[in-house]
Amino acid sequence: MKETIRIIGIDPGLRRTGWGIVESLGNSLHFIGSGTVTSNAEMDLASRLCQLHEGLSKVLHEFMPHEAAVEHTFVNKDATATLKLGQARGIALLAPAQAGLPVTEYAPNAVKKAVIGVGHGEKQQIHMMVKVLMPRASFDTSDAADALAIAICHAHHRQSIVSARRMQALLAG
């Protein structure tokens, strides 16, 4: 018998971290919620990371997802910005792990391919397909829409991931 799995997708960012929650039952997806957690740019880095952690922890506590998916970050020419984004990504991995959730990471191209069918696409295409796949989905920011796309990607890939984890457990035990 299939079970409903609640998934949180997280799109890390230091200014805004998007989150999106979907429920997956077999091949059907249902929108649960989405939003952003923000940090105050006037504050020091440690305080901003704390704000992101507290905000994500509240979302996790409120919606009680079963699994989490986080997008890999890309490296750009600005090393300082890349490092700060990496630290925000660390928070995006830490918060669900602290809540006891299995966390899976996806490359941006994998997310695009899962949602629009190709690994290279525009944000508008992704946002449109999120609405096609889940007509009741609502999102106020691009970050929240991207987070929903990450959750959708995980819903599409999770069965093979679950099977691989079971196989590893059997081989280890």
Curated annotation (Swiss-Prot):
Catalytic site positions: 11, 71, 143
- Which reaction does this chain catalyze? Endonucleolytic cleavage at a junction such as a reciprocal single-stranded crossover between two homologous DNA duplexes (Holliday junction)
Might you give the EC number(s) for this enzyme? 3.1.21.10
Top-rank lineage group of the source organism: Bacteria
Give the protein's biological function. The RuvA-RuvB-RuvC complex processes Holliday junction (HJ) DNA during genetic recombination and DNA repair. Endonuclease that resolves HJ intermediates. Cleaves cruciform DNA by making single-stranded nicks across the HJ at symmetrical positions within the homologous arms, yielding a 5'-phosphate and a 3'-hydroxyl group; requires a central core of homology in the junction. The consensus cleavage sequence is 5'-(A/T)TT(C/G)-3'. Cleavage occurs on the 3'-side of the TT dinucleotide at the point of strand exchange.
Q: Where does Mg(2+) 2 bind?
A: 71
Q: What class of enzyme is it?
A: hydrolase
The record describes its quaternary structure and partners as:
Homodimer which binds Holliday junction (HJ) DNA. The HJ becomes 2-fold symmetrical on binding to RuvC with unstacked arms; it has a different conformation from HJ DNA in complex with RuvA. In the full resolvosome a probable DNA-RuvA(4)-RuvB(12)-RuvC(2) complex forms which resolves the HJ.
- Spell out the InterPro entries in the cross-references: RNaseH-like_sf (IPR012337), RNaseH_sf (IPR036397), X-over_junc_endoDNase_Mg_BS (IPR020563), X-over_junc_endoDNase_RuvC (IPR002176)
Report any Pfam family annotated for this entry. Answer: RuvC
One annotated GO molecular function = DNA binding
Gene Ontology cellular-component terms for this entry are: cytoplasm; Holliday junction resolvase complex
List the HAMAP family hit by this protein, alphabetically.
Answer: RuvC
Question: What are its cofactors?
Answer: Mg(2+)
Record has DNA damage as a keyword: yes
UniProt name for this protein = Crossover junction endodeoxyribonuclease RuvC
The UniProt note on the cofactor reads as follows: Binds 2 Mg(2+) ion per subunit.
Fetch the CDD domains from UniProt.
Answer: RuvC
Question: Per the UniProt entry, what are the Gene Ontology biological process annotations, in alphabetical order?
Answer: DNA recombination; DNA repair
Q: Which UniProt key words apply to this protein? A: Cytoplasm, DNA damage, DNA recombination, DNA repair, DNA-binding, Endonuclease, Hydrolase, Magnesium, Metal-binding, Nuclease
Q: Which SUPFAM superfamilies does the record match to this protein? A: Ribonuclease H-like
State where Mg(2+) 1 binds. Answer: 11, 143
